[in-house]
Structures are given as structure tokens and as C-alpha cells.
């Protein structure tokens, strides 16, 4: 089964940048909100769904199992189910399901569970192809909130920020052979973050770009050689790097909360040049910002303190507009519009413009709390909630009616 540019096969979409490139969406919704196509009860977890062709892949926890399910994307009907035991317990009382969004590539589904269980599953049949217990294999210490970064899968490699070691050698980042799970290389002593790596090309050279617990890191995906790095983390031990790097041409935008802030760098060969950095513009706690026409759109501030929704000039870091105490959420760029899903379960549509925030449509689509990033494919939105007794996954038709 091939993956098209209109699918949503991984975290943050086809290019892992939060951009939807499918058919246009409606500019307004009925009074009751977008048409609900189907909904399905789901288990625990912060992992959003992914869509490839007519398949939706859901990764959640049901009882004491982490479960991977394939559904018909248009009807919600089950296709297959794959499960394995889990004993993960959250030390802070949060949801105990998986955090990392699955990846669909080359006819396989890759999942990375809360305890570091990395699995490759056949997309057509649901049969296990290979699996690695990365926590045990690489002696990974339990982090604050479990394993959360979705692996980067490209060119026959699965690259993950494991944060461990391999027989005395550093294994902060590990590359596995995509078809067999064999270890290709291990690199760096960087601990695991909650951010997902992205693939980028600088000066004709393919690069794996990561924001680990220690900071920004660029690796040669073929060998694991370090191409560039820059420390970027809070002085507080009880802090996280969670938003993914955003690549814009030869520049990389990174952001974190906990008095860390944001920075924009230019990549020239193996050299990083800082363009600007500050903590007052766009400190992303969990959700990754999107870029449109030279403006960043995203959340500024800690999730638990009701962050602001902001527009920030990419070139300078100047704040163009800010909606204070907006509540946390996720933002997706669809054409020239922002699709915002708040933790409260409210979906909003607004033009991506730097002069003011002007919502065009809004609707309550799920009960709180919604932390998982939604999937948007062929004009259909797939979103799920968690932290309730009645978690559900919903499919909405956002196409013009």
C-alpha cells in the first residue's frame, strides 16, 4: 500500500512539519459543527492516529496491553488488531497509554511504546515483523513521562532518540534497519527527549535533526556522525524538550518552555549560526509551531498555566499578535488557514495572517482532555481525547459541503 502526499502517515503529517496538503477545507461549519462521520471508543494514550490510503492506524492502551489497530478510515470498521503486554506506570499520575504517534512507511507500521517497545508491523495483515525492547537492550533509565518521540523512518532506517548505551558505547540515538530491526549504528550520549526527529536536506546533504534532552543535534542518517549540535535545555532538571525542530530551507527553529525559549539557526555545512534567540516570543511546551509566509504560529508558555496562542515573525522573533490564556492545544496549517484543536476539545479555524487572530469557525468536537495531535487526510479530521472514562476517536468531514 503506497502513501500519498494527501495522507497523514506520521506525526505532524507527510513532511513532519504540521502542514496539510490535501483538498481544500470548508471555510465555515454548520451551527452544530462539522459532520461527524463516525466515532469509536478508545483506550488510554496521547498518541494521535495516522492515515495511509484507506487505513487509519490507532495506537492506544487497553487494560494491560499496548494495542495497535487498523481501521477503515472512512467507516471506522476494524481491519486488524495487534497487542502486547505493558506494565508502564506514570510517576506523576498522568495517562498511562502510549505517547509516540505511529509511523507508516513502505507497507509497515512502526510504533514506539511508553516503555520503549519498538515494533514493526505489516500494514496489510497486522502481523509482527520485528520488535526491540529498547529500554532493556540499551539500559535506558525511565524518564519523567515514558518514551514519547516518534521515530524518523526514511531510506530504510528507523532513527530514534533512545537515550541509552550499548555495551559501554553511547546510544543516545540509534538507527535500526527498517525491514529487520538490526542495529545500523549508535551515536551520542544525548538523553531522550519527548520531541520527534525530522529529516532535512542542507546543501544537498540529508540530515536527521533532533531536539534531544541536551539540545539541537544534526546527524548523518547513513552513519550517525555528528554534523552539528548546540546545547538547548532548561537549567531546571524537572523540564522537558518536547516540540519538534521546524526546518525552513537552510534554517532550523527550535523551542522549549521552562525559561528556555526559542531560537532560529542557519545551517552552513556543519556550522550552526544563531540568527536570534529569546524566551519572550514563542516558548513551545509540547506542541510544535507551524510556519506560513514568514510567520510562526504556535503556543507560548507552559501547558498547565494556560499558554498564549501567538503569531511571531520568523526572521526576527517579534510577536505580531498574542491571545493570552488561550489554553494549550495543537495547530495544523491547511492551505492559508490554521486548524487549532484546543485541549478543551474545541476545534477552531482561522486565517494564517500576521495582523490579527480572526476565527472563522469553531465547534466542540470532543470532551476534554485532548492532547493527541489529530490527523488530517483527504479533508477528513481524525481526533481523539484521553484522561476520561469514555475516551473516543472521532472522524469529521471538513470538506466543503
Regions found by a protein language model. Name each.
Residues 3-401:
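Noncatalytic, solvent-exposed loop/strand surfaces
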Amino acid at each position: 500500500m503506497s502513501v500519498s502526499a494527501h495522507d497523514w502517515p506520521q506525526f505532524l503529517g507527510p513532511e513532519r512539519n504540521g502542514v496539510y496538503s490535501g483538498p481544500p477545507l470548508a471555510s465555515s461549519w454548520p451551527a452544530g459543527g462539522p459532520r461527524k462521520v463516525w466515532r469509536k471508543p478508545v483506550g488510554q494514550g496521547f498518541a494521535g492516529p495516522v492515515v495511509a490510503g484507506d487505513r487509519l492506524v490507532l495506537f492506544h492502551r487497553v487494560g494491560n496491553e499496548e494495542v495497535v489497530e487498523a481501521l477503515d478510515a472512512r467507516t471506522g470498521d476494524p481491519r486488524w488488531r495487534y497487542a502486547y503486554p505493558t506494565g508502564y506506570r506514570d510517576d506523576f499520575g498522568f495517562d498511562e497509554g502510549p505517547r509516540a504517534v505511529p509511523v507508516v512507511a513502505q507497507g509497515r507500521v512502526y510504533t514506539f511504546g511508553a516503555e520503549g517497545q519498538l515494533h514493526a508491523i505489516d500494514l496489510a495483515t497486522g502481523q509482527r515483523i520485528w520488535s526491540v525492547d529498547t529500554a532493556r537492550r540499551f539500559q535506558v533509565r525511565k524518564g519523567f513521562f515514558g518514551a514519547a518521540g516518534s521515530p524518523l523512518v526514511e531510506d530504510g532506517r528507523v532513527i530514534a532518540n533512545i537515550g541509552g548505551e550499548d555495551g559501554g558505547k553511547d546510544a543516545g540515538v540509534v538507527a535500526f534497519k527498517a525491514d529487520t530491526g538490526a542495529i545500523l549504528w549508535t551515536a551520542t550520549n544525548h538523553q531522550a527527549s519527548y520531541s520527534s526527529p525530522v529529516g532535512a536536506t542542507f546543501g544537498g546533504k540529508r540530515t536527521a535533526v533532533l531536539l534531544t534532552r541536551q539540545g539541537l543535534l544534526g546527524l548523518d542518517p547513513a552513519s550517525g556522525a555528528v554534523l552539528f549540535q548546540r546545547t538547548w535545555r532548561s537549567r531546571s532538571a524537572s523540564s522537558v524538550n518536547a516540540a519538534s525542530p521546524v526546518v525552513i530551507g537552510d534554517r532550523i527553529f527550535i523551542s522549549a518552555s521552562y525559561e528556555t525559549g526559542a531560537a532560529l539557526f542557519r545551517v552552513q555545512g556543519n556550522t550552526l549560526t544563531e540568527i536570534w534567540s529569546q524566551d519572550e516570543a514563542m516558548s513551545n511546551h509540547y506542541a510544535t509551531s507551524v510556519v506560513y509566509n514568514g510567520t510562526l504560529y504556535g503556543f507560548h508558555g507552559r501547558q498547565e498555566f494556560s499558554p498564549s496562542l501567538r503569531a511571531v515573525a520568523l526572521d526576527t522573533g517579534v510577536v505580531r499578535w498574542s491571545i493570552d490564556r488561550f489554553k494549550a492545544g495543537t495547530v495544523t496549517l491547511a492551505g492559508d488557514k490554521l486548524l487549532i484543536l484546543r485541549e478543551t476539545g474545541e476545534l477552531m479555524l482561522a486565517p494564517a495572517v500576521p495582523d490579527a487572530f480572526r476565527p472563522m469557525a469553531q465547534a466542540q468536537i470532543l470532551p476534554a482532555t485532548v492532547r493527541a495531535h489529530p490527523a488530517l487526510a483527504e479533508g477528513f479530521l481524525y481526533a481523539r481525547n484521553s484522561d476520561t472514562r469514555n475516551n473516543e476517536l472521532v472522524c469529521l468531514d471538513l470538506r466543503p459541503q
